[in-house]
Amino acid sequence: MTVDERSGYLKPHWPAIKAPRLAGTYQPQPALRIEIPQPHGRLRQRGLPPVTDRVIQPAIAQVLRWMWEPPFHPNRYGLRRMRSAQQALHRAQSEVIKGRKWVVALDFDSVFDRVKQDRLMPKLKAEIQDKARLGLLNGYLKSGVEINGRYEKTAEGVPQGSPRSPLLSNRVLNELDRERERRGHPFVRYGDDCPIYGRRPRAGERVKQSIPHFAEPTLGLKVHVAKSAGVRPCNRTVLGFTCSPRPGHTLKVSEKAVEKVNHPVRGLGRRTRGHCYLSAYR
């Protein structure tokens, strides 16, 4: 069944689709794994759920989002209602204005793919009382993936491509947010991008060395210490922007973001003389 055929199929078959899911007896089908090219030759894995599950999973995510919204740390801005990337940028800018002229960027290794399911499920059981809903979540986590027509189990990770994946990974990262708060680290988080701000390079170095000792054994998240670095805010890109070192600390679009836009634009027309710029867009 295709996405275009979904609406005509769901209406007459909805009672039969809904019943096993409410009873907790539904066995989710594996997601179709695809790979999307990323900059620097990397590949990002995505899991495309079956068409019927694309209706069910947003409903589950909506309930979990309502349940987990209050405990989420206030410095987390990604994938939350009434919060935006612009707010995250202004919060980062305010930390620099306060005199925190050093920022540590921790490089996590594929957060979505590293979530330990055996550590996540006990936490979900403590928070979700509905056994049918809990069983459905567990079934989705254990459903595995289909790669080139071949089934593979998934003992860890929450495949990207469904509405529940960022929510579950953020549930795990919220523990790291609370640990940063306990240590007094000023930070701003949007997804897995989480710059930590300090006043001196020495403080940044301590953060870079200490956070992995919590993230790896407690959450199962691997930090690339060699790739993590402490830099000036003017040299650290946050959501495509840097913070100027000049008075006022204005936000500036990063050179990489500008190049990302300019590169395809250059291919729209040849470099010739004597043409109106409007003709390049026709």
Features from the language model and the residues they span:
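Charged boundary/loop elements
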Residues: 1, 62-78
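Amphipathic alpha-helical blocks
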Residues: 5-28
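Conserved polymerase palm-domain catalytic core
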Residues: 20-24, 28-35, 39, 71-75, ...
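Conserved phosphate-binding loops in nucleotide/dinucleotide-binding enzymes
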Residues: 45-50
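Duplex nucleic acid-engaging cores and interfaces of nucleic-acid transaction enzymes
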Residues: 51-52, 56-59, 93
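A conserved non-catalytic segment of reverse transcriptases
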Residues: 142, 218-282
